[in-house]
Amino acid sequence: MKDDVLKQQAHAAIQKKLGYAFRDISLLRQALTHRSHHAKHNERFEFVGDSILNYTVARMLFDAFPKLTEGELSRLRASLVNEGVLAEMAAEMNVGDGLYLGAGELKSGGFRRPSILADAMEAMFAAVSFDADFNTAEKVVRHLFADRVRRADFQNQAKDGKTALQEALQARRFALPKYRIEEQIGYANDSMFVISCDLGELGFVCRAKGTSRKAAEQEAAKEALKWLEEKLPLKRKKK
């Protein structure tokens, strides 16, 4: 009974920070339910929420930075829409207090796990769209990301590893890299991935580890990019 009251209080606080009050509170509960809880969970919600988030931030950047190219806008969006930023935002909103987790996840500190927090944020954007409509969900995203977009500085945003490697290979007219899972160590909720990055005709393959597939791919891409720039530096055009 006490846990129910605490969850209700947490959900009320989350809605206040979202700037939106749910008519159907069960949608918010599902958005905050991890698959380990063995109930209606939030994975399908994430699918919709990810699209809402990416579109909205893309439009915000499009309007805020009229002189940036498509590639520059994509990199800037990647610096704002990622697991780290979403998890940070969720922590600021105390989303972890409102999560429904299975016993194993709860014991291992799942309410602090960045991937779980980030997924819950995306799921909540979807839940708002289901409870109201797309425009309302867009307003919620704009409300949460307004300050971050205002502070965004393209010149200080480092390209993510995979994007930088792709552009470097294209500039040298080589095929795109291939990523493959070489090994997955540990259990589903506490895994370590080993990913290989293969540069094909260049004959270079490297491996990297990460706590998620995406993180490992980024690290492998950075290693491959370092090798590429050392072995095949681009000649600067004379002015």
Swiss-Prot record:
Database matches in NCBIfam families: RNaseIII
Cell compartments where the protein resides: Cytoplasm
Example of a GO biological process term: tRNA processing
UniProt keyword terms in alphabetical order: Cytoplasm, Endonuclease, Hydrolase, Magnesium, Metal-binding, mRNA processing, Nuclease, RNA-binding, rRNA processing, rRNA-binding, tRNA processing
Family, as annotated: Belongs to the ribonuclease III family.
Cofactor(s) the protein needs: Mg(2+)
Catalytic reaction list: Endonucleolytic cleavage to 5'-phosphomonoester
Species: Neisseria meningitidis serogroup C (strain 8013)
Protein known as: Ribonuclease 3
Record domain RNase III: where: 11-133
Function (record text): Digests double-stranded RNA. Involved in the processing of primary rRNA transcript to yield the immediate precursors to the large and small rRNAs (23S and 16S). Also processes some mRNAs, and tRNAs when they are encoded in the rRNA operon. CRISPR (clustered regularly interspaced short palindromic repeat) is an adaptive immune system that provides protection against mobile genetic elements (viruses, transposable elements and conjugative plasmids). CRISPR clusters contain spacers, sequences complementary to antecedent mobile elements, and target invading nucleic acids. CRISPR clusters are transcribed and processed into CRISPR RNA (crRNA). In this organism endogenous ribonuclease 3 and Cas9 are required for correct coprocessing of pre-crRNA and the trans-encoded small RNA (tracrRNA).
EC annotation from Swiss-Prot or TrEMBL: 3.1.26.3
Keyword Transferase listed: no
GO molecular function: double-stranded RNA binding; metal ion binding; ribonuclease III activity; rRNA binding
Residues engaged in binding Mg(2+): 46, 119, 122
An example Gene Ontology CC term for this record: cytoplasm
InterPro entries given in the database record: dsRBD_dom, RNase_III, RNase_III_dom, RNase_III_sf
Broad class of the protein's primary localization: cytoplasm
